[in-house]
């Protein structure tokens, strides 16, 4: 953060950044934030203005938590990837003798994590202003105005390839 004054107008600017991986391999959050505060005073402090703008952008990738239970129960002697599983991006997958998917079998937990793309992006801006004016002729009498604005926009998507075993049950 940075504080100071320009032509007797005090200000404070702050920026923030976070990029953190989740507990599961594909989970992640990236957050970018910024804020600006202005606090000018005029006419021997009879007019006070406090204004602020805060903004943020949050990008999330949510890991497939089904992979936790599957990892606990999945056969540990099977490889994560193996030859002959091109249809499943090389991930070992339980198949029937005819080569079709065993729909009741556990899905490879790494396949669950790496083929599940669940993301959200949220942008938000909050702006506020307070204007307070003490009347010169009667300083106990004040006019006060508070205004605010809050804007938020979000978008999310979930993508699972059609060939993924978790799509077979749909």
Residue positions per predicted region:
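Residue-level signature of outer-membrane beta-barrel architecture
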Residues: 4-6, 36, 40-42, 131-135
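Alpha-helical scaffolds flanking conserved acidic
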Residues: 29-31
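Outer-envelope beta-barrel architecture signal
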Residues: 7-11, 45-49, 139-143
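Acidic/polar N-terminal loop/beta-strand segments that form early-domain functional surfaces
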Residues: 5, 14-16, 134, 146-148, ...
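Short strand-turn segments of transmembrane beta-barrel domains in outer membranes
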Residues: 1, 11, 15-27
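Surface-exposed loop/interface segments of Gram-negative outer-membrane beta-barrel transport/assembly proteins
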Residues: 1, 23-24, 33, 37-126, ...
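Ser/Thr- (and often Asn-) enriched beta-sheet segments in non-cytosolic proteins
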Residues: 132-134, 141-142, 153
């Amino acid at each position: 953060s940075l504080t100071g004054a320009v032509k007797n107008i005090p200000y404070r600017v702050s920026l923030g950044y976070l990029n953190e991986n989740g507990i599961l391999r594909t989970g992640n959050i990236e957050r970018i934030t910024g804020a600006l505060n202005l606090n000018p005073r005029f006419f021997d402090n009879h007019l006070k203005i406090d204004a602020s703008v805060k903004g943020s952008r949050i990008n999330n990738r949510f890991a497939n938590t089904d992979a936790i239970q599957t990892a606990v129960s999945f056969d540990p002697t099977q490889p994560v990837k193996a030859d002959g599983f091109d249809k499943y991006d090389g991930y070992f997958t339980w198949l029937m003798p005819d080569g079709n998917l065993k729909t009741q079998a556990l899905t490879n937990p790494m396949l669950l994590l790496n083929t599940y793309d669940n993301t959200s992006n949220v942008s938000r801006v909050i702006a506020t202003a307070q204007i307070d004016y003490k009347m010169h002729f009667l300083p106990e009498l004040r006019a006060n105005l508070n205004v605010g604005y809050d804007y938020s926009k979000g978008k999310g998507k979930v993508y699972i390839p059609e060939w993924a075993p978790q799509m077979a049950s749909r």
